[in-house]
Amino acid sequence: MGYMCDFCGEQRSMVYCRSDAACLCLSCDRNVHSANALSKRHSRTLVCERCNAQPASVRCSDERVSLCQNCDWSGHDGKNSTTTSHHKRQTINCYSGCPSSAELSSIWSFCMDLNISSAEESACEQGMGLMTIDEDGTGEKSGVQKINVEQPETSSAAQGMDHSSVPENSSMAKELGVCEDDFNGNLISDEVDLALENYEELFGSAFNSSRYLFEHGGIGSLFEKDEAHEGSMQQPALSNNASADSFMTCRTEPIICYSSKPAHSNISFSGITGESNAGDFQDCGASSMKQLSREPQPWCHPTAQDIIASSHATTRNNAVMRYKEKKKARKFDKRVRYVSRKERADVRRRVKGRFVKSGEAYDYDPMSPTRSY
């Protein structure tokens, strides 16, 4: 078992971020680096599986491990590495942004067994790794018989969320603690780390839904309005073939909190606990985010400090302009500041250039036509 994620501290770290100098699991990597445009530019790669503290640069195909430069040199080029020096190694490329599962597969095509065949993978990871969403929109589980929980159909498409595609009597369901009563109540998506090919499905749509969601019109049915309200609310309905990413698309943080039960639940995504019903579900646009937060945004109204700082800047700019205008009007000619002192100094007697008092000897008298020595 490797080191824990530096962000959540619950899942095994798999990705190393060079800018943050942090080891993250796939879940936290998606949540942290999708916050803004600056974080999407961070360069990330796999974490070294030997030291768990440095970014991996090569992948050893024989040992099936990712190694940093130091661990690669000590394991393959060291003094006691005669047998391992001929191992086949491949360079690991870095990535940035929030790539999809297909893009991650192309980047790390040589190490797709990283989580699937790992003996250190938890039972929860194994169970969620088997749950996928196919193109038809039905929840399939490979290798496990699909059993549908029989419940009366309702008019709300979101109520199909309570039906799980995991068999009630299967060993996987027992390990996961999943049943028809506590699937939405006890499963927290943040605490589940998954394989690379399942990275997009869970965090593109919060968690997998059963066939009941898609039988009632697909994902687009959650956002469609009644025909009676189309005249007042001009909102185009989403396509039934919408991808899982469109389920979560918003201009701010990807936060979705909903539940099909009337009681309060603790379904969590990105660390936010949802306490809403299916009827209250809304698209995570900029307007709905303000309704969910119900907090005054600091950038809407200027504070008193901003006003004071702006006034100080205006005063300073005006003073600089006045200084420049006075500097242009300066005159550098010689002027006498005290004319009366100048007139008296021109007629006083001196000795060696200094003024003398009345009655004392002097060597220069400006009033005398001839100089006395």
From Swiss-Prot:
Family designation: Belongs to the CONSTANS family.
Name of the protein in its database record: Zinc finger protein CONSTANS-LIKE 10
GO molecular function: DNA-binding transcription factor activity; zinc ion binding
Zinc finger (B box-type): 5-47, 48-92
Domain CCT, first and last residues per copy: 316-358
One GO CC annotation: nucleus
Top-level division of the source organism's lineage: Eukaryota
Natural source organism: Arabidopsis thaliana (Mouse-ear cress)
InterPro entries: CCT_domain (IPR010402), CONSTANS-like_Bbox1 (IPR049808), Znf_B-box (IPR000315)
Residues annotated for Zn(2+) 1 binding in this entry: 5, 8, 28, 33
Subcellular location, record wording: Nucleus
Location of the region described as Disordered in the Swiss-Prot/TrEMBL record: 152-172
Binding site for Zn(2+) 2: 48, 51, 71, 76
